[in-house]
From Swiss-Prot:
Purpose of the protein: Part of the ABC transporter complex MalEFGK involved in maltose/maltodextrin import. Probably responsible for the translocation of the substrate across the membrane.
Stored InterPro entries: MalF_N (IPR035277), MalF_N_TM (IPR048464), MalF_P2 (IPR029345), MalF_P2_sf (IPR047103), MetI-like (IPR000515), MetI-like_sf (IPR035906)
Major place of residence: membrane
Assembly and oligomerization: The complex is composed of two ATP-binding proteins (MalK), two transmembrane proteins (MalG and MalF) and a solute-binding protein (MalE). Protein stability and stable complex formation require YidC.
PROSITE patterns associated with the record: ABC_TM1 (PS50928)
A single BP term in Gene Ontology: DNA damage response
Phenotype upon changing residue 401 to A/C/K/L: Reduction of transport rate
Protein name stated in the entry: Maltose/maltodextrin transport system permease protein MalF
Transmembrane segments: 17-36, 40-58, 67-92, 276-306, 319-336, 370-392, 426-452, 484-505
UniProt xrefs under NCBIfam families: PRK10999.1 (NF008232)
Protein family membership: Belongs to the binding-protein-dependent transport system permease family. MalFG subfamily.
Gene that this sequence comes from: malF
Length: 514
């Protein structure tokens, strides 16, 4: 007799479809909000990932995809999506001066005003639960007073000329500061019809819009009469001369426009960017190669030593040698920064006492790079040592016994047996280590901050900067403004370079071992 297995209430199809339906409605609501805010890329990404997830978990035929979907969704959200955004920004002029859309930049400019009339001193006086606004003309000595009003929203106050002083004590600067936004929304109308608004914490003045938008999209400065047109090549409203050519004046804020390959060509044509970029690229490759070589060499040698059968206290040595890996890297880096201090660091004190020298670790390019390699080797060798310790267990003892019978010594065993058998399984990990050190942002940022700085460059660049640090400084530390478009272009080039180097290394390794 067949046994029908009873389902629990939480396993019912009705509950499943109800939950999926609610999730679908929530996702649809979020997508509509993103689209309404102009975040089209976020809206499309959310729609694709959510729709795929709902389909996979609702369809029995896609059951196997339930195990793959979380990983693929995570990769798409945290790897592919930022990559696409970075590449998209690289083809724009997006920067600290060009962050807004054209419509928003135009709106900001049209909201600006200028003082076009008299300036009046004002006072704020309590009238029970309400307030009265008093204006005084310093030139004529006339005083004006409003009826009692309450703060809240935009409002127009009709003022009357008066000779009597308002009752109550005049509000101090603290009260005016607390109600500054409400006062800014007030338009005071004088008996002659002139309108004045708050221009400072103690004054009202006549204001007019600074710019007027003409029918052809031209902005006219009402104060100077200069005309401006949107220049979509640079993303700014730019002045135009009498003969219709572009002038020198630009209005901020600018707006974001597509610039094509301009940011990429700047990297290779602007000498102020090209020279530091090429020099930093070479240093980045050299730094990564030397670091990988030294960490593997030190880690492999130490792994062989702690695996030596005749060595006593091997467990203690293993723990001590692995300690640098257990300490968070940023703590070790900051400790080394103090140890390498040129004036008070223990390393310079020791070198001065023994050899009479005090290297300029932070001001000389060569010694600064040497310091970086020393610190990075210290941080990286424990990882390689742990890997080699595990791989050494897989080497048969028969090989060493046979070599001993042939009269081979420790060095011959290492170079003829140990190294060839370890290097092949270590190769993928060495490539991964190379890629990691190629983008080792934290080490440079905490230890040297890219210094010492290079002179004569268009963008901020240092002798110890890696490409990723150079990109960061362009994006967030540029003296002439944050240039996100150029930084995104360099980040895209870094991605292509690291990918190309990894492919070349993998192919070279495959050819070698095939």
């Amino acid at each position: 007799m067949d046994v029908i297995k009873k389902k629990h209430w939480w396993q019912s199809d009705a509950l499943k479809w109800s939950v999926l339906g609610l999730l679908g409605l929530l996702v649809g609501y979020l997508v509509v909000l993103m689209y309404a805010q102009g975040e089209y890329l976020f809206a499309i990404t959310t729609l694709i990932l959510s729709s795929a997830g709902l389909y996979i978990f609702a369809n029995r035929k896609a059951y196997a995809w339930r195990y793959v979907y979380p990983g693929m969704a995570g990769m798409g959200l945290f790897v592919l999506f930022p990559l696409v955004c970075t590449i998209a920004i690289a083809f724009t002029n997006y920067s600290s001066t060009n962050q807004l859309t054209f419509e928003r930049a135009q709106e900001v400019l049209l909201d600006r005003s200028w003082q076009a009339g008299k300036t009046y001193n004002f006072g704020l006086y309590p009238a029970g639960d309400e307030w009265q606004l008093a204006l005084s003309d310093g030139e004529t000595g006339k005083n004006y007073l409003s009826d009692a009003f309450k703060f809240g929203g935009e409002q127009k106050l009709q003022l009357k000329e008066t000779t009597a002083q308002p009752e109550g004590e005049r509000a101090n600067l603290r009260v005016i500061t607390q109600n500054r936004q409400a006062l800014s929304d007030i338009t005071a109308i004088l008996p002659d019809g002139n309108k004045v608004m708050m221009s400072s914490l103690r004054q009202f003045s006549g204001t007019q819009p600074l710019y007027t938008l003409d029918g052809d999209g031209t902005l006219t400065n009402n104060q100077s009469g200069v005309k401006y047109r949107p220049n979509n090549q640079i993303g700014f409203y730019q002045s135009i001369t009498a003969d219709g050519n572009w002038g020198d004046e630009k209005l901020s804020p600018g707006y974001t426009v597509t610039t094509g390959w301009k940011n990429f060509t700047r990297v290779f044509t602007d000498e102020g960017i090209q020279k530091p970029f090429l020099a930093i690229f070479v240093w980045t490759v050299v730094f990564s190669l030397i670091t990988v070589f030294l960490t593997v060499a030190v880690g492999m040698v130490l792994a062989c030593l702690v695996q030596w059968e005749a060595l006593r206290g091997k467990a203690v040595y293993r723990v001590l040698l692995i300690l640098p890996y257990a300490v968070p890297s940023f703590i070790s880096i900051l400790i080394f920064k103090g140890l390498f201090n040129q004036s008070f660091g223990e390393i310079n004190m020791m070198l001065s006492a023994l050899f009479g020298v005090k290297p300029a670790w932070f001001s000389d390019p060569t010694t600064a790079r040497t310091m970086l390699i020393i610190v990075n080797t210290w941080l990286g060798y424990p990882y390689m040592m742990i890997l080699c310790m595990g791989l050494l267990k897989a080497i048969p003892d028969d090989l060493y016994e046979a070599s001993a019978m042939d009269g081979a010594g420790p060095f011959q065993n290492f170079f003829k047996i140990t190294l060839p058998l370890l290097i092949k399984p270590l190769t993928p990990l060495m490539i991964a280590s190379f890629a990691f050190n190629f983008n080792n942002f934290v080490l440079i940022q905490l230890l040297t901050n890219g210094g010492p700085d290079r002179l004569g460059t268009t963008t901020p660049a240092g002798y110890t900067d890696l490409l990723v640090n150079y990109t960061y400084r362009i994006a967030f530390e540029g003296g002439g403004g944050q240039d996100f478009g150029l930084a995104a272009a360099i980040a895209t080039l870094i991605f292509l370079l690291v990918g190309a180097l990894a492919i070349v290394n993998l192919k070279a390794t495959r050819m070698k071992f095939d």
